[in-house]
A protein has these predicted regions:
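Electropositive phosphate-/nucleotide-binding environments in soluble metabolic enzymes
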Residues: 16-23, 46, 50, 65-68, ...
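A charged N-terminal "starter" segment
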Residues: 1-129, 168-177, 204-207, 211, ...
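Active-site-proximal loop/turn and secondary-structure-junction residues that shape catalytic pockets
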Residues: 46-48, 69-70, 90-91, 111-113, ...
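Active-site loop/helix belt of alpha/beta enzymes
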Residues: 138-277, 351, 379
Length: 413
């Protein structure tokens, strides 16, 4: 991929996505469940660009949404309503009504209160709501605490006994149709053992429900498959799928999974231009035009993305300590223009001297990059570009100042 040409053509900061890589990841995951009925529902929150959603819908993907906005995005991008799932711990009435009116595949419920509210709304609309219940198996996903969701101390889902009670209520309700069961224990999971253990617990509950004449059709294992940012080892897809399927013996269910980061994470790159270097005593900084409002993961999660620089036609990667003196690489922080000490994209990285206009490329930026960006410091958000079959095309233009203030200007009087 010619990052220098893309930066010259579209400017920086810039997100670039490799659509061919996304297709490869989707097909690899889908094929790992080839012996079973399965549905891969892409987690829209990871990267919600309409062109990304349209591309994945064309491959046959379903969509896991956590707001009515994401449901509407998926529909706008061409998704079939019967391949959309609405999740999320706090759904408003208008979101539940929209899901009911558009007859999506199922609504993942997270509490008894939510079930009662949905039942009331379905009755008002004269509908029967297809539901799944998110079961919290009390499993430690061994990931960052901000993205761990499968423990009793987390806000997500209900315990096994509460789930049974909810399913029995739904079975006897004319306005609820229990069709699925759901669990999701966390994100960026690189050890599949907790996922398989959670599947075992939920599968046993599914057998109990089937015995009680509750026809569970969809077994949703959630998402969370991790990717390589640095030195991690990526889970083996065959072992992941077979570990789940081994627990489903005798169960006639469609397996649903909800990957987000796994599909788009390593398909994305964040390009930012060097403004200048500066030194505070012995501390070296490379100041770039990208910032925490563009890519907040390093500041928010202490995430460490691999980076490299492009200078004078050369690709300059981080190097090991023994190479530093020979190549004139020195430790530095890559920081942005925002008025926060937490505004950094990388810390303590070994890079060579860089000049204004050189590029810094941050890898693994396709998930939770642009999706979590903001207009902090009244900065317009970056443009997004897709590359497919060697061709590049704009999929979101750069925000202008007028875009940023558009919703406020009319109130100036």
């Amino acid at each position: 991929m010619d990052f220098t040409n893309l930066a010259q053509k579209y400017g920086t900061p810039l997100y670039v996505y490799d659509f061919d890589y996304m297709a490869h990841r989707y097909e690899a995951l889908k094929s790992s469940f080839h012996a079973r009925k399965s549905l891969v529902c892409y987690a829209v929150k990871a990267n919600s660009n309409l062109s990304v959603l349209k591309f994945l819908a064309g491959l046959g993907a379903g969509f896991d949404c956590v707001s009515v906005g994401e449901v509407r995005r998926a529909l706008l991008a061409g998704a079939k309503s019967y391949q959309i799932i609405l999740s999320g711990v706090g759904k408003r009435d208008d979101e539940l009504k929209f899901a009911l009116e558009n007859e999506i595949l199922m609504i993942n419920l997270e509490s008894e209160a939510e079930m009662n509210r949905l039942e009331t709304l379905a009755k008002q609309l004269g509908k029967s709501a297809r539901i799944s219940i998110r079961v919290n198996p009390d499993i430690d996903a061994k990931t960052h605490p901000y993205i761990s969701t499968g423990l009793n101390e987390n806000k997500f889902g209900v315990d096994l006994q509460t789930a049974k009670k909810m399913y029995l209520h739904a079975k006897n309700s004319p306005h609820l149709e229990p069709v699925g069961i759901h669990s999701h224990i966390g994100s960026q999971i690189t050890d599949i053992k907790p996922v398989i253990e959670a599947a075992k617990i939920v599968a046993n509950l599914t057998r109990e429900l089937k015995a009680a004449q509750i026809d569970i059709k969809f077994f949703d294992v959630g998402g969370g498959i991790g990717i390589v940012y640095g030195d991690e080892s990526e889970p083996d897809l065959y072992e992941y799928a077979q570990g789940i399927l081994a627990n489903l013996s005798g169960l006639d269910v469609t397996v649903v999974c909800e990957p987000g980061r796994f599909i788009v994470g390593n398909a994305g790159y964040f390009l930012t231009s060097v403004l200048y270097e500066k030194f505070n005593k012995n501390k070296r900084f490379i100041v770039v035009d990208g910032a925490m409002n563009d890519l907040i993961r390093p500041s928010l999660y202490q995430a460490r993305h691999k980076i490299f620089a492009l200078s004078g036609g050369n690709t300059l990667c981080e190097c090991k300590t023994e190479q530093l003196r020979e190549l004139k690489f020195t430790p530095c922080d890559v920081v942005g223009p925002i008025c926060e000490s937490g505004d950094f994209l990388a810390k303590d990285r070994n890079l060579p001297p860089l000049n204004p206009g050189d590029l810094v490329v941050i890898k693994s930026a396709g998930a939770y990059g642009f999706a979590m960006s903001s207009n902090y410091n009244t900065r317009g958000r970056a443009a997004e570009v897709a590359v497919k079959g060697g061709e590049d095309f704009l999929i979101r233009r750069r925000e202008s100042f007028e875009d940023v203030v558009a919703l406020e200007r009319e109130f100036l009087g």
